[in-house]
UniProtKB/Swiss-Prot annotation:
Gene field: uppP3
TM regions (residue ranges): 5-25, 42-62, 89-109, 117-137, 192-212, 220-240, 250-270
Record's catalysed reaction(s): di-trans,octa-cis-undecaprenyl diphosphate + H2O = di-trans,octa-cis-undecaprenyl phosphate + phosphate + H(+)
Protein name stated in the entry: Undecaprenyl-diphosphatase 3
UniProt keywords, alphabetically: Antibiotic resistance, Cell membrane, Cell shape, Cell wall biogenesis/degradation, Hydrolase, Membrane, Peptidoglycan synthesis, Transmembrane, Transmembrane helix
Function: Catalyzes the dephosphorylation of undecaprenyl diphosphate (UPP). Confers resistance to bacitracin.
One example of a Gene Ontology biological process annotation: regulation of cell shape
Subcellular location: Cell membrane
Note: Bacitracin is thought to be involved in the inhibition of peptidoglycan synthesis by sequestering undecaprenyl diphosphate, thereby reducing the pool of lipid carrier available.
The protein's enzyme class: hydrolase
One GO molecular-function entry: undecaprenyl-diphosphatase activity
Source lineage: Bacteria, Bacillati, Bacillota, Bacilli, Bacillales
InterPro entries: UppP
Enzyme Commission designation: 3.6.1.27
Amino acid sequence: MEQFYYILKYLILGLFQGLTEPIPISSSGHLVLAQHLLGLKIEGFSFELLVNSASLLAVLLIYRNDLIRLTKNGLSYIFTRAEDAKSDFFFIIYLVIATIPAGVIGVLFKDYIDQYLKGVKMVGISLLITAVGLWIIRNLRGRRNDGDLSMKDAIIVGLAQACALIPGISRSGATIVAAMLLGMKQETALRFSFLLYIPVSLGGLLLSITDIAKDPNLDTLFVPYIVAFIATFIMTYISLKWFMNIMAKGNLKYFSFYCIIVGVLTLIFL
């Protein structure tokens, strides 16, 4: 019976992670709220690594063609200086640059964030901040595409991503808001945001992979972890595909409304 409880518990959290990771409502914030509301407590740091890895796998699957093209053209530009591969080469460079702020800030301030910025009230405040950002860009229609990006754009979007280390600040929301305020087209902002998710997640996974082996709960939670991984992967794939359709229709304001409602309810009742 206890094993069934653990499986159900991690299934719920995995579905939460998968649903909220791609869309701009903060997966980390919703995991904090889910644990609080359902009386759940995650045993061990491995769970966070596990579900992030599952979401990463789903993003890799969806953007596989972009990744293949970027890799091919990036190498082509390095060895042949082919002009038609130049924009993809620099797109990769800008992704690397945009990864740095979150990596540096995460390493330097991880303990502070864990101790002071992961409370339920902080999640409520951060969700309201996310809502404001999404509302501001609700009607923006940029003109800049992949080939128009610059180092300044990469740094600004990277700093926006670093803000999402705070639960309640959506990573996809923060990066898309920053990108669209810089004049990027919606599809360019979306692609840059989720391709940027890949190196950040890989970096975090590689830096913390030993924590999985050291997790004292791994033996008892192996099956629940696998259930959570599968649930997160499937839900992330579905959720990201759905979000891409929402972006194409310009309906980001609904996510703003949602974040306002959840943020206010969190501050009032939790």
